[in-house]
Amino acid sequence: KVFAIDILDMEKIDGVNFFQISIEKIEEIEEIDLLKGKFNLVISDIAPNLTGITAVDCANVLDLNHLTISTAHKFLEKGGALIMKTFQNNNLKSLRKNMELSFKLVQTYKPAASKKQSGEIYIYGVK
């Protein structure tokens, strides 16, 4: 099964169960909550609305990343993987160290499709 959650509406995709809800409330969805520890992959491209104030934006990104890691840790099976969007900033090193506490393999990568000047990167972790 494929589940998608987002605070914004999403176009229907065959085979995808979509829930318009914040990640903070994912455990309120019984169909998903019953599958704790059974997901083999969690993909997150969550990003906050950017303010242009670096300190605020970095803190907001970090908060969402920690929420994503916590959620993935609850729902992933052993050997399951997390792919999470984040941004290159002063918090990246500590974020990666935090992930290394819960995941046996952690790697960062920048997709070829991402613009060179963009700070967007992805962190991959295997539980």
Identify what each model region corresponds to:
Residues 5-51:
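S-adenosyl-L-methionine
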Residues 60-78:
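A short glycine-rich, Lys/Arg-flanked "PGG" loop and its adjoining helix->strand segment in the class I
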